[in-house]
Design a protein with these regions (language model features):
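Short, solvent-exposed, charged loop/turn and helix-capping segments
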Residues: 79-103, 115-127
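Amphipathic alpha-helical coiled-coil segments with heptad-repeat character
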Residues: 24-28, 57, 64, 92, ...
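Generic structural signal for well-ordered, non-transmembrane alpha-helical segments
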Residues: 36-46, 50, 68-79, 100-114, ...
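Immediate post-signal-peptide N-terminus of mature secreted/exported proteins
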Residues: 21-73, 172-181
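A charged, solvent-exposed segment within the mature domains of Sec-exported extracytoplasmic proteins
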Residues: 118-181
Length: 181
């Protein structure tokens, strides 16, 4: 009886160690590209946002031009990221849900910024421009769960493998440094 029990325990140990998680494997090129695509979707908007904040609020024409640049940068970046992330697929079985939620967020964000472009273009460049542009953006938003972006970062940072990948990623480094890289 002891021999059979010992054999069963050993067999279970061998089988469970053979089925290691994704964490046990080195980062693949595709997984690194996925991390880069995730962070890369946010960098153009961050840079355009910094440029917008640097504008003199009294120069409404410059503020409008910078705001439109922000809308365009985000639209393009989210559309490109959606294509790249779809092409790459989920980085691992453990992150399939994270990938699906991120895909939805990126898609909704791209549509939101695209929908905001025309209403923002129609706005007069005056003292109320910024407030009116923010309202137009909020009114056209199609993002059902904005917290998904933070949840994606949290899920990746919980994983030593993906946390390290974020640390090595150039686009993620740009995000962390606020575009100062």
């Amino acid at each position: 009886m002891r021999t059979r029990l010992l054999a069963a325990v050993l067999a279970t140990a061998v089988l469970t160690s053979a089925c290691g998680s994704d964490e046990d494997k080195p980062l693949t090129d595709a997984q690194g590209q996925w991390v880069d695509a995730f962070c890369g979707a946010l960098v153009p908007g961050m840079k355009a946002g910094l440029e917008l904040k640097a504008q003199d609020p009294a120069d409404a024409k410059a503020v409008k031009a910078a705001y439109l640049k922000l809308v365009t940068a985000n639209t393009t970046a989210f559309v490109d990221a959606e294509k790249k992330l779809k092409e790459l697929g989920a980085p691992s079985d453990e992150l399939k849900d994270v990938h699906e939620r991120l895909m939805k967020y990126v898609s909704e964000s791209a549509r939101s910024y695209e929908a905001a472009r025309a209403p923002v273009e129609k706005l007069e460049p005056n003292a109320q421009f910024w407030e009116n542009a923010e309202k137009a953006l909020a009114d056209t938003s199609q993002v059902s769960r904005p917290e998904e972006l933070r949840a994606t970062f949290d899920a990746l940072e919980k994983s030593p493998k993906y946390s390290a990948a974020i640390g090595k990623s150039v686009p993620c480094g740009e995000l962390k440094s606020g575009g100062q890289r």
